[in-house]
Amino acid sequence: MKIATYNINGINGRLDNLLRWLKEAEPDVVCLQELKCEDSRFPETALLDAGYHAIWQGQKSWNGVAILSRYGEIKETRRGLDGDEQDMHSRYIEAFING
């Protein structure tokens, strides 16, 4: 299994680069940081067309994280870290991937 992490620094502005890299590197699982997009603007269709299922927690400006997988549907198991109920930043997402 090939797992990669990628600080995308704005997913919509770098979507072409991401799609090209996914095709070339063929990672099985990718963790993205700094999406810098709201949930409604996440490019789910483009990623599905590239063969990757995704879960994400978007946020305008600095934050936002996502997990991509070639193994089909991803089951989210946690969103955010315990211990700070006031933390509204999209910095952490956890999932189960069957693969």
Predicted regions mapped to residue ranges:
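Structured beta-strand-rich core segments of catalytic domains in phosphoester-bond hydrolases
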Residues: 35-38, 44-99
